[in-house]
């Protein structure tokens, strides 16, 4: 009963902590001072899971030893050192150049204690490994821990619940999320939809503190309190795009900037009666198939010609809701993550492997102090 009570108290603390944070990801309510205060609270509230009331006792009962050893096993499972297979994976990476000066003239230079291959650059004289200047540089937690973290992200788990499941602090979850965003920056830049393209916009509300009002009431409908998110889907359902338009009401200019490089010339455009889409039809010589809201209202999914894009709207909003306190200024980062989840490869383990390969081959080191500074926590 004591163990069950402690577990319930810990769960209650986590729920209270999540309410204080208002969700996961970048919180628009966090200032540098508040971030420091919250970190102090986290240190007080998140006491070590290996701390027991009998820890100082020289003699322990069989029951106490059972609980203590079980918790230690949990901790070890969640905080393992780098495995042999992980070291072999790191050492198998094909290093092309020095991560510091870009020189191709480097040579092997022994190994680290864990067996990781070290190199030395003949140009600048600096030593490095295959992970230098990547998001895994100076890692304290094995890369293998990322597998479970990414699987949770892909399944729409909140960052706080993922951190708790993995026995990590909430700040670790946020830090890793920022690293994830960094790897995925620009991932949609070269996506081009062809064939039959379904296109429609969806909208997200601004934070309450930034809502414009009239006579003390929120503006109705599509107003400047919304952030436009343009979405296009290919008919073969193999590709999609999720791009912030930056406008509350589409214009010919914003529509061109959002979609023009992502739709192949001569494609078939299936859309609603939004007037701004006309610039795409004109400049990309698209065949237009228009279905007004009045025509599609009340239709079942199977009968609605805009279902492919409407379904993505639904999934996107479900994903965003699972991260309620996301910072609207970083909405494109969230859309890049959602794009990665929704597009090939479909298998979740293939997706995890693809991300890890992208990360180790990307010179994008993210330092903790920079990542958790005011520019990210606003």
Residue ranges and their predicted role:
Residues 2-378:
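Residue-level recognition of single "structural anchor" positions
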């Amino acid at each position: 009963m004591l163990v069950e009570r402690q577990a319930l108290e810990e769960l209650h603390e986590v729920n209270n902590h999540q309410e204080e944070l208002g969700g996961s990801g970048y919180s628009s309510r966090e200032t540098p001072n508040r971030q420091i205060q919250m970190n102090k609270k986290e240190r007080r509230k998140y006491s070590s899971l290996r701390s027991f009331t009998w820890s100082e006792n020289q003699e322990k009962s069989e029951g106490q030893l059972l609980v203590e050893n079980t918790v230690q096993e949990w901790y070890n499972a969640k905080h393992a050192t780098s495995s042999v297979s992980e070291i072999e994976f790191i050492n198998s990476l094909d290093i092309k150049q020095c991560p510091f000066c870009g020189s191709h003239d480097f040579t092997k230079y022994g190994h680290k204690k864990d067996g990781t291959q070290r190199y030395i650059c003949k140009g600048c004289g600096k030593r490095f490994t295959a992970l230098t200047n990547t998001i895994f540089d100076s890692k304290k937690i094995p890369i293998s821990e990322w597998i479970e973290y990414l699987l949770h992200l892909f399944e729409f788990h909140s960052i706080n619940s993922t951190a708790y499941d993995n026995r990590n602090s909430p700040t670790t979850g946020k830090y890793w999320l920022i690293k994830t965003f960094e790897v995925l920056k620009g991932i949609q830049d070269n996506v081009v939809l062809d064939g039959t393209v379904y296109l429609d916009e969806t909208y997200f509300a601004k934070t309450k503190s930034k809502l414009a009002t009239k006579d003390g009431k929120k503006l109705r409908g599509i107003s400047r309190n919304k952030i436009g998110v343009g979405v296009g889907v290919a008919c073969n359902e193999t590709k999609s795009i999720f791009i912030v338009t930056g406008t509350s009401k589409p214009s010919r200019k914003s529509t061109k900037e959002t979609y023009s490089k992502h739709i192949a010339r001569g494609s078939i455009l299936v859309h609603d009666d939004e007037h701004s889409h006309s610039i795409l039809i004109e400049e990309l010589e698209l065949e237009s198939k228009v279905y007004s809201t009045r025509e599609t209202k009340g239709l079942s999914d199977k009968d609605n010609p805009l279902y492919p894009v409407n379904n993505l709207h639904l999934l996107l909003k479900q994903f965003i809701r699972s991260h309620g306190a996301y910072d609207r200024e970083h909405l494109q980062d969230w859309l890049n993550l959602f794009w990665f989840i929704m597009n090939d490869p479909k298998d979740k383990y293939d997706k995890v492997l693809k991300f890890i390969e992208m990360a180790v081959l990307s010179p994008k080191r993210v330092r903790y102090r920079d990542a958790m500074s005011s520019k990210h926590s606003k």
